[in-house]
Amino acid sequence: MKVRSSLKSLKTRHRDCKLVRRKGRVYVINKTDPRFKAKQG
């Protein structure tokens, strides 16, 4: 999982990427290709 300060560019890397808020943190998740996972902060 990558840790980035900005997730906007990571969201556009794959068409199945979704932005999710969990416990005040922002994550990018991808069910079909898990190597695109990322976390902000």
Swiss-Prot record:
<dbReference type="InterPro" id="IPR035977">
    <property type="entry name" value="Ribosomal_bL36_sp"/>
</dbReference>
<dbReference type="GO" id="GO:0006412">
    <property type="term" value="P:translation"/>
</dbReference>
<keyword id="KW-0687">Ribonucleoprotein</keyword>
<dbReference type="InterPro" id="IPR000473">
    <property type="entry name" value="Ribosomal_bL36"/>
</dbReference>
<keyword id="KW-0689">Ribosomal protein</keyword>
<dbReference type="Pfam" id="PF00444">
    <property type="entry name" value="Ribosomal_L36"/>
</dbReference>
<protein>
    <recommendedName>
        <fullName>Large ribosomal subunit protein bL36</fullName>
    </recommendedName>
</protein>
<dbReference type="GO" id="GO:0003735">
    <property type="term" value="F:structural constituent of ribosome"/>
</dbReference>
<dbReference type="InterPro" id="IPR047621">
    <property type="entry name" value="Ribosomal_L36_bact"/>
</dbReference>
<dbReference type="GO" id="GO:1990904">
    <property type="term" value="C:ribonucleoprotein complex"/>
</dbReference>
<dbReference type="GO" id="GO:0005840">
    <property type="term" value="C:ribosome"/>
</dbReference>
<comment type="similarity">
    <text>Belongs to the bacterial ribosomal protein bL36 family.</text>
</comment>
